Each structure stands twice: as C-alpha cells, then as structure tokens.
C-alpha cells in the first residue's frame, strides 16, 4: 500500500513515469510479504497501465482478467487517474465496452448502496480531519474544499453522466468527466488527509465484490474501516441527537421498520430528559379530532333527557394546558404509531399551529375549552411532540405534504451492536445473513423494511447478561480460567432455544407478510431460502 500511497502523493512525469510506477504499486498489493491481498486474486484481474500521450486521458486500472491486453475494456474496475495540477482521482468505473462480465456485481442494488456509503463516510472523515485547521475565512471556500467524494445513485446507469453540478465543483477533472463521465460511478479525490483510508476502502470494496478479503494481517484494519463506513448505511440515532432536534424543530417523527426501538428511545427520552413531564399516547384508525384536540362529549345528568353535552379537552389540549401552567419545564407528547390515524382529519385546523419557527401563531378553536387554552390554541414553546411511524405498514396512507413540512423526520435503523452484545450465536448468525440479503438485493423502497434488532435478541437478554456476570464471579471461586459449570451451559442452551423460537414465531411471520404483500418481490427467492434455513434450526 505504501507504493500506491507514494504514487498518489509524489509529483511524477505522467507521460514517462506514471505507467511503470503504477504497475509496480499494483503489484505490491499482493502476497504475504507486505501485500494486502492474496496472490490468488491475481487470477481474477489484470493491470491496465497504458502509455500516455497527449490524446489519451491518463489512468491506471485493475480490471477483469477476461479483457484483452489493450484497447477498451469492460466490467468493474478500480482506477487511479492523475491530473497535472491537482491530486489524482481514485474511482470505480464501469468499462467503456459495457458492464459484462460483472453485470451480476454492478447490477446489484447493494453495489451502489455500499459505494454511496463509502463516499459519504470519506466526506465525513475529510470534514472531521480538516475542521480544526479551518479558520473563519473558510466559510467562503468552494464546495471542493468540503466534499471530496461522490457516488452515482445507480452504478448500472451508464447512460447517465456525472451531474453538471458535480463536474463544476471538481473542475480540475474536466478532461476525466468529458471522457468517462458516463462510466464513473464513484470517486474520491486523493487528498492527503484521507488518502490512505480512501485507497484501502476503494480497493477492499473492489476485491470484496470479487469475493476476496484482505490477508490475515490486514483483517483488523479491514473490519475497522468497513464497520466505519457501514454505519452510513444504517446510522445510529442517539438520544442526545434526538433531544437536540426536538429543541430545534419541536415536532419530530421517528420512522423505521419494526423492532428498531422507536418506542423505547421515545419513552427513555420522556423519562430521562423530560423528567416524566408529558405522556405517551397511541394513534389508531379510530382516533378522531374530538379525542385528540377536543369536542363535545355526552354525560349523564338529572335533566329530562338524562344527559347533556360537555366541552372536553382532548389529549393534545390536556398536555398543552399542563405545559402552559409550568412554562419553565419542558414537556413531551409521544404519539406512537402516528400514521395509523388520518392525521389531516385528526388535526383539523390545529395543524396551522404546528409551526416550529413561529411561536406566536395561534388557531381559533370551535369551542371554549376553559383554563389557559380557552378558545385559542397556541402551541407552548416548551411543548415538543415526538411521533413514531412504522415504515413496514404500507396499508397506511402516506402523510400529506402539509403535515410532512411541519415535522422533522429521523430514520431509525437496526443496530448491529445491540445484536452483537445481546444476541446468541444463532441470532447473530441469523441477523448477519438477513442483513446481507437486504443490503445486497433490496431496492431502496424495500431496504427500509430490514427487521430491527429486537427480533434477534431474547426478551430477557438484559437479565441474562446480568446473571452471566454474577455467575462468572461465582465460577471464579470454584474453578480457574472462568470455566462455566454444567448448570451454566444448560441455562445458555435454554436461552439459545428461546432465541430460535423467537426467530420462528416473530421474525418468520413478518418476512412471510413481506412476501405476501409483495414488498420483497425482487429478492423473494433469497427471503424464502432464508426462512427455510431458520425453520430448520
């Protein structure tokens, strides 16, 4: 890797030195003596380091072995393209002669998905590493100083050029875009601050797609980098981030597939950050304007009719009243399954008051509700609303634009760390297999349906973890080397059985529903095979 790093940082004569030096750098990547990949990988690829002339855009590439020794090539390629007055470009490029024989790689949704996550991570890394070196004048710097990587939404779309705004941002690379603008589907500028990481992740991505991982001595580094960029596929939502967003936007909706902990994090926030000020409610198809905002409700009395109607506050006005009574305390209203009700009807004219940037906005209500509310609804500045929404429930109508504009949306994703910490061997393996299927084959619409981590951990896992720690202390007094007793092993066996039962009774029905509803049509065979595997446990 050192020679490749030097190739990208040293000023070389592109015409005379570049081809030979780049070939040497590529060759140094293979073999246990300082290399990163096994030599058998050479059977799958060849180096293309053509001589440079004035008519040719200079490049050096690792391409599929089936290509001819010269001329245009096809398939997936890792390419480094030098330019005279700037850093080289590191890129993934589909050959000008087509994507065959790598159509099974480039055509997968996961190929583009991972390429986009890698470039997002590299941009974040570059911003982080250069932030401390910036001064106040940097606000005037061009986008080229803030963004150094880009990826096409769909790598297979070789009919689409690199967008004009991207090409203008990286104007030093105009000749490259003019020549290979349709074939480039991911690139990173070889800025020194992130160069080593960029080379590794692009190369690792290229060889992983061909079925090769780095050598044993590079495995730790490989997994560290892979885990880092993989987080951009499924970002973690932290309580502090959610709290900051609520303070800034006031009205937030957490959306994600089932089992990702949307309700849990909402209730934890209510208990810890809001000190219990507020309350959780749940919407359903029968939720009405009267139950949420307020209205006339019958009550028995001693009149001739035996009943009368009373103006009664709904769930929203109740918490508004409490927030108005204690303006120095923050209040949180949690609306679980917010999209299960017809929000336009439930909110009515009150939607006009949901304007986070206009605290003075008020709405005249149909009745006088008394108290601090009266007949005018004005959302208190200390009241925040947090909704949760299950993206797997496609039977529910999409929220209309007027409602979406007033809420900030935050995606909740399955978290591999939770499964690794609390799952059993069986559920960890099951999680990673299913995650791989969704990452590789799911469309963007289906990808958000990846079942959450709670399907892969036993319900009492936290108690089991505590018991494990207590048992370990006892074991230390009985046997050395922290050996588990037969009783411990039996308990773990029962926990494994419980975990497998949970997969069969909770996860499989969800996946079957996905198949029946047509949510996973494009990769239903893979899901069907996965279900069969789980059923055989």
Model-identified regions with their sequence ranges:
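N-terminal "first-domain core" detector
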Residues: 1-34
């Amino acid at each position: 890797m050192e020679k490749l790093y030097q190739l990208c940082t040293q000023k070389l004569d592109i015409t005379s030195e570049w081809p030979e030096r780049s070939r040497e750098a590529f060759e140094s990547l293979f073999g246990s003596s300082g290399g990163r990949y096994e030599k058998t990988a050479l059977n799958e690829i060849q180096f293309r380091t053509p001589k440079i002339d004035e008519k040719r855009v200079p490049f050096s590439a690792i391409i599929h072995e089936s290509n001819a020794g010269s001329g245009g090539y096809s398939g997936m390629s890792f390419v480094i393209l030098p330019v005279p007055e700037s850093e080289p470009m590191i890129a993934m490029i589909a050959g000008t002669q087509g994507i065959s024989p790598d159509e099974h790689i480039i055509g997968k949704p996961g190929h583009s998905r991972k390429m986009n996550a890698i470039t997002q991570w590299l941009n974040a890394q570059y911003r982080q590493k250069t932030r401390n070196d910036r001064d106040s004048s940097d606000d005037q710097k061009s986008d080229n100083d803030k963004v150094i990587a880009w990826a096409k939404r769909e790598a297979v779309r070789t009919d689409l050029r690199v967008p004009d705004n991207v090409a203008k941002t990286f104007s030093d690379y105009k000749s490259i875009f003019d020549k290979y603008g349709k074939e480039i589907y991911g690139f990173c500028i070889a800025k020194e601050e992130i160069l080593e990481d960029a080379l590794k992740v692009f190369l690792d991505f290229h060889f992983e797609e061909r079925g090769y991982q780095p050598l044993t001595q590079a495995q730790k580094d490989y997994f560290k980098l892979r885990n880092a960029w993989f987080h951009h596929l499924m970002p973690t939502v932290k309580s502090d981030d959610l709290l900051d967003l609520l303070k800034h936007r006031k009205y937030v909706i957490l959306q994600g597939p089932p089992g990702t902990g949307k309700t849990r994090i909402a209730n934890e926030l209510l208990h810890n950050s809001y000190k219990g000020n507020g309350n959780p409610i749940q919407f359903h198809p029968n939720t009405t304007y009267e139950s949420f905002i307020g209205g006339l409700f019958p009550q028995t009395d001693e009149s001739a009719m035996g009943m009368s109607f009373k103006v009664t506050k709904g769930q929203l006005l109740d918490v508004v009243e409490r927030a108005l009574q204690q303006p120095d305390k923050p209040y949180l209203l949690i609306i679980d399954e917010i999209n299960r009700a017809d929000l336009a009807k439930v909110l009515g004219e009150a939607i006009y008051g949901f304007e986070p940037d206009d605290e003075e906005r008020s709405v005249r209500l149909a009745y006088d509700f008394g108290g601090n509310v009266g007949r005018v609804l004005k959302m208190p500045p200390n009241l925040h609303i947090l909704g949760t929404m299950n993206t797997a429930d496609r039977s529910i109508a999409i929220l209309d634009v007027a409602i979406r504009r007033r809420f900030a949306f935050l995606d909740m994703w399955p978290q591999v760390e939770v499964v690794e910490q609390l799952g059993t061997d069986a559920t960890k393996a099951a999680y990673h297999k299913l995650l791989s299927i969704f990452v590789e084959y799911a469309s963007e619409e289906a990808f958000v349906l990846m079942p959450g981590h709670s399907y892969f951990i036993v319900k009492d896992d936290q108690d089991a973890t505590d018991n494990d720690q207590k048992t370990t202390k006892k074991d230390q007094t009985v046997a050395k080397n922290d050996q588990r007793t037969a009783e411990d092993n039996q308990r773990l066996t029962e926990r494994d059985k419980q975990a497998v039962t949970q997969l069969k009774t909770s996860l499989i029905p969800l996946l079957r529903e996905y198949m029946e509803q047509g949510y996973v049509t494009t990769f239903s065979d893979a899901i069907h095979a996965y279900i069969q595997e789980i059923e055989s446990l």
